[in-house]
């Protein structure tokens, strides 16, 4: 074969290879596919499920000594940060996705962080070009739009990861009245000294502003009291998620030996039954009378009314441009820039997922305090190692009123909490100017209760 012929053949082979590579790199899911199927193809082609799952599909070079170590480190970090298993199942089943999953996927695509270059340079076609990004981001937007019922958001903010709080949630007013009475009733405790409001005061931001709440007999629990305001928006209750509903949550403290210390709900019912007027009112609403189920149901119904809408930031999202300042708006942009809005999403800026504390640095080692059972977080309930130190993400509504912060309350100020999150979750140190702007944004999240700006009678001590 002549040299010229060989050269032509070689060039044809190169051109063919380049054509195949180009098609792989620019392949976009068919428009004939349903939207979820398009997204499923994108994350499959990008290799997301090779790392972000408990059963990673490792590439052949994972067995190569040097490369294998890097692969295993990347897989471990990926799975710790984001398990995409449930997202994949939801896509296949055509079910709604968790808003946190949407926010995480959206952010890495916008930032161009995933897949990493060291992956797509080996796996041609894994990278996201502009066409793929458009398909993915349109899918996120449409899915998010269908997730929220609120239609009062200004059009330009319709795709924001944060939504305004509703003015109200549908409730049975008769049950609310009973729930209000029970919420403030110390007879739910063994020694008649502690009520729900003792640790979740409605005049103290829905918390008690203490590191640990004090129960019967001067005993102290192992975590701080999360705010009761807007708790109806949490996907589960308690830091470790052991209660699926507000009613289940309401059943916990009365029987907790530290908090209210009752032996059973029969003990509570026997005390309430002595109050003839209360029993009469209760029986008018619940035909089967006093019971654990009915008591906790009434408290749940009352807690659904503990919403704090109409914050300045809510008004901004609804189109009132002068509701927040430029400095506060800059704080919100930083909040999104630093991935805060990938976990602190939705109406209450949180409460939609369990997340690991200490992604980049060991938070508990630096804390220099003895580990407790509470520090295990979700692991307490599941015994799954991945859930160790993983907690329900707290909502940030009214955050200026709810200090101290974190489950162990070792962060006294918003400034401290922001710096800690930057260090342990992102591995960075923020300049004071940026911290101040994020704090300013946080102050726009204080809402109204019963038409009045929420305040805290302890504010002078915070």
Predicted regions and their residues:
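Post-cleavage N-terminal segment of exported redox proteins
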Residues: 1-35, 112, 120-177, 261-329, ...
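Sec/Tat-exported extracytoplasmic proteins
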Residues: 47, 52-55, 75, 109-113, ...
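Short runs of predominantly hydrophobic/aromatic residues within well-ordered alpha helices
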Residues: 102, 225, 292-296, 393, ...
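Charged/polar, solvent-exposed surface patches and flexible loops
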Residues: 41, 45, 69, 73, ...
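Axial heme c-ligation environment in periplasmic c-type cytochrome domains
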Residues: 56-61, 81-102, 107-132, 228, ...
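Extracellular low-complexity, Gly/Ser/Thr-rich intrinsically disordered linkers
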Residues: 398, 405-449
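Short glycine/threonine-rich turn/loop motifs
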Residues: 23, 41, 57-86, 155-252, ...
